[in-house]
């Protein structure tokens, strides 16, 4: 059986056209890579969390932005919201398998950023060309 090269396979797979303004992938990309969404996904890699726990973990996020980001991530199937019928309200958020995969990939990018933050400093004089 003929072995196909990865570049060939990538070209053959329909992945969307992220550069097209009407592409659904772009909408997901915008929601997934938002400042708060990235931090929420990484925080939830540690396990299920309640709203207040997430708010404390993701320092600086407002209640409104946390709720909005959680709704967007849930709408894309990256996390599950579980509500318990108790007073006071008890709501938990857990990553789905797809959410775990996305979070793992995003965490690699954030690790790279933290390792290279000094080189990425806008105040640095001359960045080295490739």
Segments (PLM) and residue ranges:
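Long, low-complexity, charged/polar intrinsically disordered regions in eukaryotic proteins
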Residues: 1-14
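N-terminal helix-turn-helix DNA-binding core of bacterial DNA-binding proteins
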Residues: 15-65, 92
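Generic detection of well-ordered alpha-helical segments
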Residues: 30, 34, 38, 71, ...
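Alpha-helical linker/hinge and terminal dimerization helices associated
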Residues: 38, 42, 76, 105-120
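Basic amphipathic alpha-helical segments that dock to polyanions
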Residues: 66, 70-73
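Basic, amphipathic "hinge/linker" alpha-helix immediately C-terminal to the N-terminal HTH DNA-binding motif
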Residues: 85-108
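Exposed, interaction-prone assembly regions rather than primary DNA-binding/catalytic cores
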Residues: 122-130
């Amino acid at each position: 059986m003929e072995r196909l090269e990865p570049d060939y396979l990538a070209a053959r797979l329909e992945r969307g056209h992220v550069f097209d303004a009407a592409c659904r992938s772009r909408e997901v990309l915008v929601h997934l890579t938002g400042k708060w969404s990235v931090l929420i996904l990484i925080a939830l890699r540690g396990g299920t969390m309640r709203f207040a726990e997430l708010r404390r973990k993701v320092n600086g996020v407002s209640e409104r932005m946390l709720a909005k980001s959680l709704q967007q991530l849930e709408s894309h199937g990256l996390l599950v919201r579980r509500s318990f019928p108790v007073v006071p309200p008890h709501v938990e958020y857990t990553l789905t398998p797809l959410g775990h995969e996305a979070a793992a990939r995003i965490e690699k990018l954030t690790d790279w950023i933290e390792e290279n933050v000094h080189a990425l400093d806008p105040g640095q004089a001359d960045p080295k060309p490739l």
